[in-house]
Amino acid sequence: MKKLLLTSTFLLLAVSSIAQLFVKPTTGGSSSYVYAKNVQIYVEGTINLEKNPAGDYEGSIYLRDDAQLLQGGTATYNSGDGLLSVYQTTNADQFDYNFWSSPVGLNAGGIGNTANGPLRLNVSDDDTAIATDTGIRNFTSAWAGASTTNALTISQAWLYKYLNATADWQYIGGTDGVPAGYGFSMKGTNTTNHNDAYNDPNAQTYDFRGRPNTGDIDINLTAEESTLSGNPYPSALDLALFFYDNTDVEEFYFWDENRSINSHYYIDNQGGYGTWIPLNTTPGHQGT
């Protein structure tokens, strides 16, 4: 096994810069991977990931403990059938909505960003784990999802994307691809602790695995319409900079709901959208 460990303990600077990144199994067929913990990896060029053998170290890049992957310069689109693994944690339970945007796409086809396809969501209980868990997500047609020690069961009933062309929600179930940059709705699993969202022992950690998205990602949006979008990259996004770089954007909406109400019926729930715009607004003029 060949591995490259990048942690803030060993790097002094919490940024590692790489011209190009190519990760593939060893000549003997053993897994090779990059494990990044609490650091930023900056790749100036392209990333090519060749899939490792199935097993505990199937991924080619593991981002853990707020590690981020950034690409810039003249980087073209990524390629290969290898997997980047990045965690997202939420305490939204089987009655509460998540709005997700995948930082990865299918690890198949030619170069470039791909739709996230059938949802590849693993479950993990250890934020610094390297190994993959034995149970990839399962789907159920029931309204309520569930989780066990090593697997998630996600309800297909709440999987939707919002299309600008029709100005309406479209059911995707567990199979329809969502293009890079677009979002989708999903309810969580089990019942979580609503008293402490940041230290909830029942919170779920979702492991997004696939080819890392990169480059410019266009979201088509017609006048007077809305769309469900999100951060499509395996790194943080400065929303103010995004706002000023996109002159057609007027404002952002964030969903929140009363998570102490455990019901799937719309009439029972309390929720709504909060509006956010940066100070000294200019691009969309809505907030001025």
Language-model segments: residues:
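C-terminal trimerization/auto-chaperone modules of long, extracellular attachment fibers and adhesins
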Residues: 20-56
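A short, polar beta-strand/turn micro-motif
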Residues: 42-137, 167-251
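Charged, glycine/proline-rich intrinsically disordered loops and linkers
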Residues: 119-149, 268-269, 275-287
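Intrinsically disordered, low-complexity linker/loop segments enriched in Gly/Pro
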Residues: 137-170
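Beta-sheet-dominated scaffold domains
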Residues: 224-288
